Amino acid sequence: MSTEEQAEWFEFNQETVEALIEDGSDSTKPHTIEYHFAGDDFDVLEKAAVDAFKAGFEVGDAEELMLDDGGTIFCFDAVVERLLDVDLINADTVKLLAIAQKQNVQFDGWGTYFIES
């Protein structure tokens, strides 16, 4: 993982957390954070899922998706409950980027759901 890539994800994390809070999502309540992984080799992606599980994340079943060009890709989510705390999300990002690099799969960011105050 390059320092530049990590910095870009940290910026994404900051902007996303700020936008959620500005929109009124309750920052005092835990949010379900879904970190996304993708790859074209199911067996390799499965190894990344095992690593994410060992790192403390709940791992969903891998799904096969059809791409617009007719190709296929596999993906899964590594899920954790977190407050909207950039430091915690950045720490998760460091762990998960390392897993993605080790297993040669794509880390594809994260998402969550709005929680009303």
Curated annotation (Swiss-Prot):
In terms of InterPro entries, this protein maps to: RraB, RraB-like_sf, RraB_dom
The protein's location, in the record's own words, is: Cytoplasm
Predominant location of this chain?
A: cytoplasm
UniProt GO MF annotations: endoribonuclease inhibitor activity; enzyme binding
Name one cellular component (GO) term. cytoplasm
Which keywords fit this entry according to its UniProt record?
Cytoplasm
Keyword set includes Cytoplasm: yes
Assembly: Interacts with the C-terminal region of Rne.
Q: Per the similarity annotation, which family is this?
A: Belongs to the RraB family.
Give the protein's function. Globally modulates RNA abundance by binding to RNase E (Rne) and regulating its endonucleolytic activity. Can modulate Rne action in a substrate-dependent manner by altering the composition of the degradosome.
Question: What is the name of this protein?
Answer: Regulator of ribonuclease activity B
